[in-house]
Amino acid sequence: MKKRHQRLFLVLGVVAGVSVATALVLNAFRDNMTFFITPSEVMAKSDMPERHFRIGGLVEDGSVERDSDSTQVRFRVTDTEASVPVDFEGILPDLFREGQGVVVEGRITSNGVFKADNVMARHDEDYMPAEAQEALDRVEHSVDEVGDY
């Protein structure tokens, strides 16, 4: 075999190896990625996969129910268009309260309740996830359009 052919096979082998390695790395990232979506997006998807993901929004006013015998807490996360019931077992952050920006991480159960493994409250009371802010802006915009009639 000529040196030229050997070099060609070497280059092709390196390109194939790099391609396979890149595909494996991207696949690993995709499998470990935690998605951040709004309650409206959760409600729009009828069959949420059994994947671990995050929901961002506000703790709905009047929705927090604490179990007096345990650390079990139930509340709803809303973006004002839709809300998702959340079930959490554990200690909530000190800044957790109704009307506060929150991000919950976990899985949606077959009965539509989000089983949270982690609850993160935002330090700044003016904080709102970007997706939730966009949803609020859409609602305000649609209300303005309806009011123009």
Swiss-Prot record:
The chain crosses the membrane at residues 8-28. Heme binds at H123, Y127. SUPFAM superfamilies: Heme chaperone CcmE. GO terms for molecular function: heme binding; metal ion binding. One of its GO terms (cellular component) is plasma membrane. NCBIfam families: PRK13254.1-1, PRK13254.1-3, PRK13254.1-5. Belongs to the CcmE/CycJ family. This is Cytochrome c-type biogenesis protein CcmE. It comes from Halorhodospira halophila (strain DSM 244 / SL1). The gene is ccmE.
